[in-house]
């Protein structure tokens, strides 16, 4: 009998939990190790930055390793520590297979109670991360972090005491600061340069966000709002003038359980305040679907229309589409093929109209452990 989409999603969460190996379990303490190795073979073509040739690659696709330790105190109270690393390209060198360095993606501690919620401190995802519903494996056309940061150095609270409902709030702190004071900054007053401890230009100084998502009874609904402050670099305006972004993300979807079909509509809006410059407004809408074609095989896709505009200034419109098929060869082995196409049209009064195109297609394999 064909599984419903709801059962498929529940099964996916169960499989995800099963991927982690329990290496220690005694007296209320549980330690798990898990992760995945992911490889993708791809072909891409772009006219952005005057690129005119196609490029093929065989590379790492977000391979990762994590360790999670949970200590149960009793009466529903617990503490948890989580560390996740990723394989990425080296910052220097010419390697393009993305296996050059190991970095820390997430590292946080949690104190919680099953009925009261949990407090999370460290480098972690925020409530905005899980708001939109669109599915992708690699070429996601939604850029949610442009509207609200989806992770960072944060203090967060999450409440899951009501079945199907998640409520959350996060306070973001600066994560990228200068480590040293340069000679220019240490010299004459007003000289440009780096000062140890100061936030790096155009990086997050602080921010706050709240959100809620409901996922039950075949209905998906979510919304998040965030206000994020950035450090503008006054001495060197070429590095950027962004001061503050007020953004919102939302989703609305419905599961047709008997058909194995999920349809959704994601959207976002942001207003960017620039230092002594005109403000910028952005928004997007993105209808999408996920369909269980047969057991262990799923088809998914979404379309996005996005617009950025400055009063009496540059206007950018982007249309993008993504389509993919995945198949589970084994409960811990997933293969997929995914493609995306984006067309961006930029209009400036003195420069005319410029059109850029980008397309990518890839075949990937993930092995979980």
Swiss-Prot record:
Residues 1-20 form the signal peptide. One of its GO terms (molecular function) is porin activity. It comes from the Bacteria. Pfam families: Porin_4. GO terms for biological process: monoatomic ion transport. It is found in: Cell outer membrane. It is a multi-pass membrane protein. InterPro entries: Gram-neg_bact_OMP (IPR050298), Gram_neg_porin_domain (IPR033900), Porin_dom_sf (IPR023614). Keywords: Cell outer membrane, Ion transport, Membrane, Porin, Signal, Transmembrane, Transmembrane beta strand, Transport. Belongs to the Gram-negative porin family. Forms pores that allow passive diffusion of small molecules across the outer membrane. This is Outer membrane protein P2. It comes from Haemophilus influenzae.
């Amino acid at each position: 009998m064909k599984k419903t989409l709801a059962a498929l999603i529940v099964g996916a969460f169960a499989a995800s939990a099963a991927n982690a190996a329990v290496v220690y379990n005694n007296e209320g303490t549980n330690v798990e190790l898990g992760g995945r190795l992911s490889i993708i073979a791809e072909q891409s073509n772009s006219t952005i930055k005057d690129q005119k040739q196609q490029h093929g690659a065989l590379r790492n696709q977000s391979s990762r390793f994590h360790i999670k330790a949970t200590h149960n105190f009793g009466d529903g109270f617990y503490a948890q520590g989580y560390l996740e690393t990723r394989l990425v390209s080296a910052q220097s060198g010419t390697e393009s297979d993305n296996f050059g360095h190991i970095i820390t993606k997430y590292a946080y501690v949690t104190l919680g109670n099953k009925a009261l919620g949990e407090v999370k401190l460290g480098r972690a995802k925020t409530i905005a991360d899980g708001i939109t519903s669109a599915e992708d494996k690699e070429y996601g056309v939604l850029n949610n972090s442009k509207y609200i940061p989806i992770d960072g150095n944060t203090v967060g609270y999450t409440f899951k005491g009501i079945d199907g409902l998640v409520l959350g709030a996060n306070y973001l702190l600066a994560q990228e600061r200068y480590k040293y004071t340069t000679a220019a900054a240490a010299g004459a007053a007003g000289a440009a340069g780096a000062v140890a401890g100061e936030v790096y230009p155009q990086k997050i100084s602080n921010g706050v966000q709240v959100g809620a998502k409901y996922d039950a009874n075949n209905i998906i609904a979510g919304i998040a709002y965030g206000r994020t402050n950035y450090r503008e670099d006054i001495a060197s305006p070429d590095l950027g003038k962004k001061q503050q972004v007020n953004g919102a993300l939302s989703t609305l979807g419905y599961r047709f359980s008997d058909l194995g079909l999920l349809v959704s509509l994601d959207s976002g809006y942001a207003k960017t305040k620039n230092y002594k410059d005109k403000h910028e407004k952005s928004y997007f809408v993105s209808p999408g679907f996920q369909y269980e074609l047969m057991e262990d095989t799923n088809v998914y896709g979404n379309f996005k229309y996005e617009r950025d505009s400055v009063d009496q200034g540059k206007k950018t419109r982007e249309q993008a589409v993504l389509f993919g098929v995945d198949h589970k060869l084994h409960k811990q082995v997933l293969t997929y093929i995914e493609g995306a196409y984006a067309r961006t049209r930029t209009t400036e009064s003195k420069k005319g109209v410029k059109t850029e195109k980008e397309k990518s297609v890839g075949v990937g394999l993930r092995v979980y452990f």
